[in-house]
Structures are given as structure tokens and as C-alpha cells.
Amino acid sequence: MMSRANSRFSCQRTWLLAVVVLAAIWSSSLHQAAARVFNDDCPNLMGNRDLYKKVEWICDDCANIFRIPGMASICRKDCFFNEDFLWCVRATERTEEMMQLKQWVRILGAGRM
């Protein structure tokens, strides 16, 4: 027969186990969500997140200037390898950086099919 103290200890242990399991699941899903923040179209993103953020800044600025719904996503399409991205570079008056930005886009899109 189980005493009241043993029963309470067993219940506490069960709750502790449940909390640990839920924390592990939450942590895992949070990590996956953070990884999805970055563009899935860019195959060479790992190790080049600093380049990605610099190139993405152009799209964010463009979206802020024109306030067109989905403009930032259109600019990021195909890992920035599109005419809309080039248009945004011109619209944000960063044409002097065009060659550098194109090089970064090629690095990010290396291996893209």
C-alpha cells in the first residue's frame, strides 16, 4: 500500500517530467521557427547569414519606401536573383553597390537550380 508521502512524490515526479518534456519540445520548435526566418530559396545561406542580412536590407528598405504588400517577398524571390531586386537596388539609391550586391547574391545562390 502506497503512503500519502510516496503518492505525493510520485505525482511531483510526473509533473516534473511533463514540464521537462514540454520545455524540450518548445525549445526545439522555437529553434526550427528561428531557422525558417531566413529565406529557404538560398541554398548557400549557412555560414553566409551576414551577407544575407546585408542583401535583405535592400528589400526591407524597398518595402518601406513603396509600402506595396508583399514587396519584400517579391524582392527576395529566387534568392534575390530577379529583376525586382535590381529595381529595389536602384530605388533605394544604392547603384554604387550594385556589383558588390550581385556578387553576394551569387554567393548566396550558389548551387541553386
UniProtKB/Swiss-Prot annotation:
Any one GO MF annotation of this record: neuropeptide hormone activity
Signal peptide location: 1-35
InterPro entries from the UniProt entry: Crust_neurhormone_CS, Crust_neurohorm, Crust_neurohorm_sf, Hyperglycemic, Hyperglycemic2
Keywords per UniProt: Disulfide bond, Hormone, Neuropeptide, Secreted, Signal
Disulfide bonds, paired cysteine numbers: 42-79, 59-75, 62-88
Annotated Pfam families: Crust_neurohorm
GO BP of this protein: circadian rhythm; neuropeptide signaling pathway
Main location: secreted
Alphabetized Gene3D superfamilies for the sequence: Crustacean CHH/MIH/GIH neurohormone
GO cellular component terms given for this protein: extracellular region
Compartment list: Secreted
Presence of the UniProt keyword Disulfide bond in the record: yes
Keyword Lipid metabolism: no
PROSITE patterns, per the entry: CHH_MIH_GIH (PS01250)
Family, per entry: Belongs to the arthropod CHH/MIH/GIH/VIH hormone family.
Job of this protein: Inhibits Y-organs where molting hormone (ecdysteroid) is secreted. A molting cycle is initiated when MIH secretion diminishes or stops.
Name listed for the protein in its UniProt record: Molt-inhibiting hormone
Gene from which this protein is expressed: MIH
